[in-house]
């Protein structure tokens, strides 16, 4: 019970309580599960608390905006594009208190080192991303980030076939590329029963 209370209230802890130590929060789940929306909600709360916030996203994700993170529900927050995790570290100002990172799965494994370093400096690090690729395999560096995070939030979507809680991102077009940026035009949320690994477009809609 104490652990559950800590997870619910961690974002409201004043810096005087946690001293100089930062922490890492990971928001993970399938597409359309509200990851970016939850990230933006936490960032807005930090700004209301007058904390300095910086937000980053991978350069390759320009689906909705070049200089904002945007949820599927149209929530928005200003962000800076980064080509690599090391570039994020270089861009973080010394007085920044909260760092938000969206689409963590698109960064390399160096993101783990960067997140740890920022937390060591006393920064609250919030990372949102897909924990599985379109085949259902763990998507690095998200598993490693989940292992080192103090706080983890697992989000779920609604299966587009049966309406049950969805944990998978079903690709609805033919491609074997692991990274294929898209939205509802290319992917559907699926539950365990309805998810078809390696499915191509004709199979998906049977």
Q: What do these predicted regions represent?
A:
Residues 151-162:
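Conserved AAA+ ATPase "SRH/arginine-finger" region at the nucleotide-binding site
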Residues 103-118, 132-139, 203:
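Conserved ATPase-coupling elements of RecA-like P-loop NTPase cores
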Residues 42, 113-121, 141-148:
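Catalytic-core regions built around general acid/base machinery
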Residues 94-98, 104:
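Short acidic/histidine-rich motifs immediately flanking catalytic phosphotransfer sites
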Residues 97, 149-150:
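Conserved acidic residues
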Residues 52, 124, 151:
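Residues at the starts of beta-strands that form the adenosine-phosphate
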Residues 2-94, 133-144, 157, 172-173, ...:
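Conserved P-loop
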Residues 100, 123-131:
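Structural recognition of the conserved hydrophobic beta-strand(s) that form the central parallel beta-sheet
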């Amino acid at each position: 019970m104490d652990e559950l209370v800590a997870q619910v209230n961690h974002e409201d802890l004043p810096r005087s309580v946690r001293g100089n130590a930062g922490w890492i929060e990971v928001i993970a789940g399938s597409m359309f599960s509200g990851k970016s929306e939850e990230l933006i909600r936490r960032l807005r709360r930090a700004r209301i608390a007058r904390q300095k916030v910086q937000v980053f996203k991978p350069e390759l994700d320009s689906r909705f905006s070049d200089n904002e993170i945007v949820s599927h529900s149209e929530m928005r927050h200003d962000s800076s594009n980064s080509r690599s995790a090391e570039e994020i570290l270089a861009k973080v100002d010394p007085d920044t208190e909260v760092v938000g990172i969206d689409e963590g799965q698109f960064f390399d494994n160096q993101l783990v080192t960067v997140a740890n370093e920022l937390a060591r400096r006393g920064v609250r690090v919030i990372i949102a991303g897909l924990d599985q690729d379109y085949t259902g395999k763990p998507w690095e560096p998200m598993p490693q980030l989940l292992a080192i995070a103090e706080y983890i939030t697992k989000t779920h979507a609604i299966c587009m076939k049966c309406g049950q809680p969805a944990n998978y991102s079903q690709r609805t077009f033919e491609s074997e590329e692991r990274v294929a940026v898209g939205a509802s035009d290319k992917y559907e949320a699926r539950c365990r029963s309805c998810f078809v690994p390696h499915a191509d477009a004709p199979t998906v809609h049977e």
